[in-house]
Amino acid sequence: AESWFGGIAGREGDRETAADIEPLLKRTDLVADMSFYFLYEATDLLLREQNCKLENDGVLLNMLPGFYSQQSHLQRFTKLFEDQPINKEKLILTLPQSTVLSANKATLEVISRYIKNGINLLLDGWDYRSFPVDKVRELGIKAVRPDPSLYLSADFAGVLSSLPDLGITVYAAGTETSDAFRWLAACKVSHIAGPICGHEMTEDDIIRELLLKDRENA
C-alpha cells in the first residue's frame, strides 16, 4: 500500500512508492530487514482496524524473494506481537510453492518454525498435481492460492471444493475474469487476497472501505 512507505526529504507531500525502494529490494542483505518492515506496517494496520472495532479477515503480505532462505527472525516477530497485540492468524505471509519444492533442509526448518509458532503461511501458486493436498496438510499449511492455469478444470474443482472441510482456506488473487470468479464461487472459494478490481489500495483506502461496510451492516 502506498501509505506504508515514508515521506521523501525535501519533497513535502510526496511519498515513496515501490519504484523508489526497488534498488533496496535487490540487495539480498536487506531482505530480512525489509521483510520485517513490511510485517511491522501490516501489524500496525491490523491494530488500527482493531482499535476502530472493524472486522477484516486479515492482511496478506507477498514476501520478498529469498525471505525463507534467511535465518528465522521469530524472536523479533514475537516481540512485535507483544508490543502490538493482534491475532497472528490475521497476518498472512505468502510462501511460493516453488520455494518449498526447491528448499534445502535449513530452509524447510525455517518454514516449519514459522508455522509451529502460529505464523499464518499461504502456499502461493499451488498446483495439487506437484504438491498434493496431503502434503499441504502435513506441512501445516492452512491457506493456499492456486495457480490460475488450473482454473476451470473439472478435476481441480473437486479438489478445491474439498479443502474447506479440511480446514484449508483458498484465496483468489482478485484479478480473475468473471468466468473464473463464477467457477471459484462454485468451488466454495470465498476469500480474495486483494481488491476485486486488482488496483492498489492505501491503508486509508482499506480503513475507509471497512467503515463503509460496517455502516451498511449496522
Regions found by a protein language model. Name each.
Residues 50, 69-82, 102-110, 130-143:
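Distinct, well-ordered alpha-helical segments
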